Amino acid sequence: GITPMKKILNRFGLGKLVYLFVALKQLLFLNPSQVSVNMDGNSETWSKVYFIAVMNQKYEGGGFKFCPNASSSDGMLDVIVVEGLSKLKVLFCLPTAFFGRHTRFRGIHIYQCRDISVESAVPLAIHKDGESGGIHTTFSVSMEPEQIQMIVPDSK
């Protein structure tokens, strides 16, 4: 659903700012945690992960260009891992994500894979296309080889 804050901001044409406010709120209260990731059989563990996003589009909530080279047609998942940074540095990097310029900062990693499984030391909030997926310590995402067939009416 739409939050009361988003409704107010929508009246002024600023609805996308709600995502920035949510990100700032999460950053203030979030403690980074140890996370282990397996991507296509390759494992990596980080001790101070702020968040991981698995995407097949460039943009996420409010226009953040977290995975600037993501494509829905390449058959790959694009993954961003933000880890090992101070909260101040994450705060500094966040606005650059609107333009996809955050990838140059140390502690921000971009990967491509077909399958990913994530295991966290503490339960984390999971979001699926902007909707809550609950609180979990593990999750997996796979890119399926089939594409959705679309039926589009003739334009007359």
Feature map (PLM): residue ranges:
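Long C-terminal subdomains/extensions of small-metabolite kinases
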Residues: 1-156
